[in-house]
Amino acid sequence: MTSSKTGQITIRSIGAGGDGVANLPDGQIYVPFTLPGEVVNVARDKNRATLMALLEASPERQNPACRHFEDCGGCALQHWQDEPYRLWKRELVVGALKGRGIDVEVAPLVACNPHTRRRAVFAARKTEKGVLLGFNRHQSHEIIDIVECPVTVPEIIARLDDLREVGALLAPGSGPFKLAATLTESGLDLAASGCGKLNDEQRRALTALVIKKDFARLSHEGEIIVEPKKPLIHFGKVPVPVPPGCFLQATAEAEETMAALVLAHLGKARRVADLFCGVGTFALRIAEKSAVHAVENDAAALAALDRGVRHVQGLKPVSIERRDLFRRPLMPKELLPYNAVVFDPPRAGAEEQALELAKSKVEKVVAISCNPVTLARDLAILQKGGYRIERVTPIDQFLWSAHVEAVAVLTKGRQ
């Protein structure tokens, strides 16, 4: 097959991005929504191809859980049965570690249930027929107007029409914008972006609608427009008033799993540094048994953590520090007071911090990541510095996607 022709190919594997991979004389091509062993007709465009016809289906193929699958770009792998899908996702972590020469125990993938994603960031656009609200088509800016989503919590999906009403008041002409909905204990927290400057009339109308529809809050580009109820989420026993757009783990059940792994490894550590702590996802749970120093560059997240701590008794001391750990990682001397360190950086990882941590005498480390490649890089740095990687646990909190969370626990010296 030439680089711009149609033809028949056989899928050999699933790539790291969730697409089927076929090996051709002039290189690999990637075909979404296919499975290993399948024979397919495709239309090729350089190293990518569109599935035109499924000629021989894999026995591992199943009916997708959503009517929008293959149109909506949110999911890549609903068509794959659970067992091979989970083995493949675990292998993403195993492969990344092996790529750095790390041979360590990788636990079976911890599965997460459908209907548990607590935040959805919808693409939206106003049309003559109303507001389109959903997700972008695979590798496109076209918005697929959804009526269901088996990934997202029902509390959000049940409010799609209400969200469209909010979108109609936000809409900047016919241009696209984003409307995120997060499930909190106080109700849905809405955060809009890309809508341009809101005028006074829009603000009044939005305020009335948010109150009428019983949403907890609406913000625009980080500015709170109306907040009938303070959006709260508990981390352990601490209720935290989460700021607009703050980082949260994708699902509450995955967060509980990660927290349990963190706490089990820390054991009786007296003092813990929680780096890239966010709003206190782990720090506030750790504080039930250990003194915690929570470090984060997001001022709003730190302020929310601090407000949560001030309203709960019985915690060990919690100190906070605003710091850009990419530019100013904690140095070995600064790490001397701590028995343990937890770090959960963005997808880019924590290379600079890992380099300093590797030189430290900290006895226990927990590394959490949504990117196996940067996690493996950081673990290799720590391993070179004398840390022993005890175990890595992959967690499927990004269901039917090519993304996977992982928690690694490490030790150094006598335990």
Curated annotation (Swiss-Prot):
Enzyme Commission number(s) of this protein: 2.1.1.-
Q: What is this protein called?
A: Uncharacterized RNA methyltransferase BR0438/BS1330_I0439
Sorted keywords for this record are:
4Fe-4S, Iron, Iron-sulfur, Metal-binding, Methyltransferase, S-adenosyl-L-methionine, Transferase
- What's the superkingdom here? Bacteria
| Cross-referenced PROSITE patterns | SAM_MT_RNA_M5U, TRMA_1
Presence of the UniProt keyword Metal-binding in the record: yes
GO terms for MF: 4 iron, 4 sulfur cluster binding; metal ion binding; rRNA (uridine-C5-)-methyltransferase activity
Q: Which family does it belong to?
A: Belongs to the class I-like SAM-binding methyltransferase superfamily. RNA M5U methyltransferase family.
Q: Which residues bind S-adenosyl-L-methionine?
A: 249, 276, 296, 344
Q: Name one Pfam family in it.
A: tRNA_U5-meth_tr
Q: Identify the residues that bind [4Fe-4S] cluster.
A: 66, 72, 75, 149
Active site annotated at which positions?
370
Keyword Transferase tagged: yes
Q: Any one Gene Ontology biological process term?
A: rRNA base methylation
Species assigned in the record: Brucella suis biovar 1 (strain 1330)
